[in-house]
Design a protein with these regions (language model features):
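N-terminal signal-anchor transmembrane alpha helix
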Residues: 1-22
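Transmembrane alpha-helical segments that form the membrane-embedded catalytic/substrate-channel core
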Residues: 15-22, 85-96, 143-157
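Cytosolic, membrane-interface loops and tails of multi-pass inner-membrane proteins
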Residues: 21-45, 155-167
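Core segments of transmembrane alpha-helices
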Residues: 51-69, 111-117
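Transmembrane helix-loop-helix
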Residues: 59-87, 133
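Membrane-interface helix caps and helix-loop-helix hairpins in membrane proteins
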Residues: 71-75, 93-103, 126-128
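Hydrophobic alpha-helical membrane segments
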Residues: 83-92, 103-123, 144
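Terminal transmembrane helical module of multi-pass membrane proteins
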Residues: 118-167
Length: 167
């Protein structure tokens, strides 16, 4: 099995990228406006320890999806999880362009975008299933990730409020 056909590449890419965010977001927020329009970058979280909770939760999801994919030999599950991750990486580049500045996560995004595309292409070659399954699984995973992202930002905000006595 080659590196790019492993179901375990996605969690590794995720941790490499999110480590940059976890380390750099708090200091970046001290000197930069965190809003793009009405949307606040990084879910409004200002502390690395709280951000780490959200990163850990997402990492566990990626590990679970990779494990299930490995156990049932179903690469489409990892493909479906990699697509929102790729969009997340692209979003960092877009945010940096909009801000005309460095945004935490942009360096690893630039490094990882080509790697992630190659990874997706390798996994797609391994996926030999009906087209309807592609649509169902990809839509289900996108919806699950969107709901989870909203959920984890609410949880992180509440934890930050409680721990750092905000509000």
């Amino acid at each position: 099995m080659s590196f790019f056909s492993s179901y375990w590449v996605l969690p590794l890419l995720f941790m490499f990228h999110d480590f940059e965010e976890m380390v750099l977001v708090p200091s970046w927020l001290l000197n930069h406006d965190s809003y793009i329009g009405k949307k606040q970058l990084f879910g409004g979280v200002h502390h690395s320890d709280v951000l780490a909770i959200g990163i850990w939760e997402e990492f566990c999801i990626y590990l679970l999806l990779s494990t299930v994919s490995q156990l049932i030999n179903y690469p489409l599950l990892v493909v479906a999880a990699t697509l929102p991750y790729l969009f997340h990486l692209i979003a960092h580049c877009v945010f940096s362009i909009i801000k005309h500045a460095f945004v935490p996560g942009v360096v690893t995004s630039i490094i990882e975008i080509p790697i992630t595309i190659l990874y997706l292409l390798a996994l797609i070659k391994l996926t030999h299933i009906a087209i309807w399954q592609w649509f169902v699984v990809i839509i289900a995973v996108f919806v699950a990730f969107a709901v989870n992202l909203q959920f984890i930002h609410i949880i992180m905000s509440r934890i930050e409020d409680a721990v750092y006595c905000r509000k």
